[in-house]
Amino acid sequence: MLTLKIFVYTVVTFFVSLFIFGFLSNDPGRNPGER
């Protein structure tokens, strides 16, 4: 049970950091014509 919780926390943290990094890095390059 503890291993499952650690695995879930690791996956959630990984996806959150990946989403934040992708949003920050792709925000100016995703729509360069709007700004």
UniProtKB/Swiss-Prot annotation:
Assigned GO CC terms: chloroplast thylakoid membrane; photosystem II reaction center
Entry keyword annotation includes Ribosomal protein: no
Main location: plastid
Membrane topology designation: Single-pass membrane protein
Keywords: Chloroplast, Membrane, Photosynthesis, Photosystem II, Plastid, Reaction center, Thylakoid, Transmembrane, Transmembrane helix
Transmembrane segments: 4-24
Family recorded in the similarity comment: Belongs to the PsbI family.
HAMAP family in alphabetical order: PSII_PsbI
Protein name per UniProt: Photosystem II reaction center protein I
Organism: Oltmannsiellopsis viridis
Taxonomic classification: Eukaryota, Viridiplantae, Chlorophyta, Ulvophyceae, Oltmannsiellopsidales
